[in-house]
């Protein structure tokens, strides 16, 4: 079996940061085997291709002269930064216009992908793009092509591209995975006969076990955790294996971002994702489904591992901007991480998700600022106590207001998530 494996990240998810999941799997598989994994970011390629075409006047979007000027300024703002990036009023105006333009184009293409997948109606640009993407994924002759899906909008493009991959190379194995795939019922994914496997929840161990089983020529895959596979001998036509505990942070290598072009992401400087824990430390919010992406209870890496990963990224890629993508991090862990960053003199800035608990004292938030925190996205959800209690958030409106005031005093900008409806 060919040792080359590719993992595709397909449109549509606006590329503001580098993909994390495929980078974790690449590092894990390559450290524990002799397979070679290439992460292919078709998503970033698509957005850059559209923006470049629009700037050159070659897109189907018809701009007025003023709209074209604004689009040009917005693209430059996201790509190069400059004074306009720090002018809040102008940033908001340009980013809203840029986003609305992008959304229009996404919707046109999404409709084309859905018509192709559901009805076999091919709009020429959709067919041409899917064939182009498939040929790119097959250029290095892989034996396995994986598709990493975080969002619903990536599903139809991934399905159509996978169809063309299989049509061009029938013996290639197609594997779907990622957060969105984990939330789908297997019958939805396996309605597409060219998809061979689904890896659900955390994919590192299961994906590597699958590659090794295929390499041995196995036709049954009963013992592989976190895997759904086709079996013609059972009524549903597929078998869902039990999930296994997550790979221990102690044995998991740092993510490998070497396949990505850092200038392809719409930020003046690349923002690297950091996952310091898996699952949620609170894990009680009644509306939340994020637990479906994980295997088992909350697990956190120790502070040395987290700061070591940040230091590795700084030294390897020369980056200074980071995003913690944990579901939430406790104030105590934030404090320890920040203190270690300060002690080591690691000069970075970062943002993170957080739950507005009163245990975010002024002292903790001040230390977080000194350690590089500049922006916190708070899960406030509601200012109504009855609604908060029904959500099991464990907060109060007055407590939230106090935490936000403390954060502002520390110099950290606040972003509030509110559920309306």
Model-based region annotation:
Residues 250-415:
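Radical SAM [4Fe-4S] cluster-binding motif and immediate context
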Residues 93-133, 144, 269-290, 294-297:
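Active-site cores of enzymes that catalyze phosphoryl transfer or operate on phosphate-rich substrates
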Residues 9-12, 147-151, 324-327, 354, ...:
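Short glycine-centered, acidic/aromatic-flanked micro-motifs in structured strand/loop junctions
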Residues 5, 37, 174, 224-225, ...:
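Hydrophobic/aromatic residues located in beta-strands of well-ordered beta-sheets
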Residues 3-4, 12-49, 102-242:
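Glycine-rich beta-alpha loop elements in corrinoid/cobalamin-binding modules
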Residues 41-43, 292, 418:
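Residue-level recognition of beta-strand->loop/alpha-helix junctions
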Residues 38-127:
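Conserved N-terminal ligand/cofactor-binding loop architecture of enzyme catalytic domains
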């Amino acid at each position: 079996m060919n040792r080359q494996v590719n993992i595709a990240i397909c449109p549509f998810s606006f590329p503001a940061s580098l993909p994390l999941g495929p980078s974790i799997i690449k590092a894990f598989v390559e450290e524990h085997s002799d397979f070679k994994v290439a992460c292919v970011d078709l998503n970033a390629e698509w957005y850059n291709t559209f923006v470049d075409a629009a700037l050159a006047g070659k897109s189907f979007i018809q701009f007025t002269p003023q709209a074209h000027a604004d689009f040009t300024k917005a693209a430059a703002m996201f790509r190069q930064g400059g004074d306009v990036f720090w002018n809040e009023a102008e940033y908001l105006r340009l980013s809203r216009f840029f986003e609305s333009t992008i959304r229009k184009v996404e919707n046109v293409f999404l409709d084309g992908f859905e018509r192709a997948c559901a009805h076999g109606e091919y709009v020429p640009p959709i067919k041409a793009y899917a064939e182009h993407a498939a040929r790119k994924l097959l250029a290095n002759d892989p034996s396995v092509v994986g598709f990493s899906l975080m969002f619903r909008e990536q599903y139809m493009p991934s399905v159509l591209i996978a169809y063309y991959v299989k049509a061009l190379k029938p013996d290639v194995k197609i594997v779907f995975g990622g957060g969105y795939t984990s939330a789908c019922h297997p019958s939805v994914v396996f309605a597409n006969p060219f998809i061979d496997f689904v890896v659900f929840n955390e994919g590192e161990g299961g994906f590597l076990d699958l590659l090794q089983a295929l390499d041995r020529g196995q036709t049954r895959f009963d013992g592989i955790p976190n895997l759904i596979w086709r079996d013609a001998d059972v009524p549903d036509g597929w078998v869902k294996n039990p999930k296994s505990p997550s790979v221990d942070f102690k044995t998991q290598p740092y993510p490998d971002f070497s396949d990505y072009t850092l200038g392809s992401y719409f930020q003046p400087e690349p923002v690297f994702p950091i996952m310091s824990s898996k699952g949620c430390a609170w894990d009680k919010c009644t509306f939340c489904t994020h637990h479906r992406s994980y295997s088992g209870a909350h697990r956190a890496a120790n502070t040395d591992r987290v700061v070591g990963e940040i230091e590795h990224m700084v030294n390897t890629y020369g980056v200074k901007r980071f995003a913690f993508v944990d579901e939430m991090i406790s104030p105590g862990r934030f404090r320890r991480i920040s203190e270690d960053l300060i002690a080591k003199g690691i000069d970075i800035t970062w943002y993170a998700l957080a739950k507005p608990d009163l245990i975010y004292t002024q002292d903790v938030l001040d230390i977080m600022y000194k350690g590089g925190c500049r922006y916190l996205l708070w899960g406030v959800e509601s200012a109504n106590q009855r609604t908060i209690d029904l959500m099991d958030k464990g907060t109060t409106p007055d407590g939230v207001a106090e935490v936000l005031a403390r954060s502002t005093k520390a110099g950290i900008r606040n972003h509030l998530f509110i559920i309306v409806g």
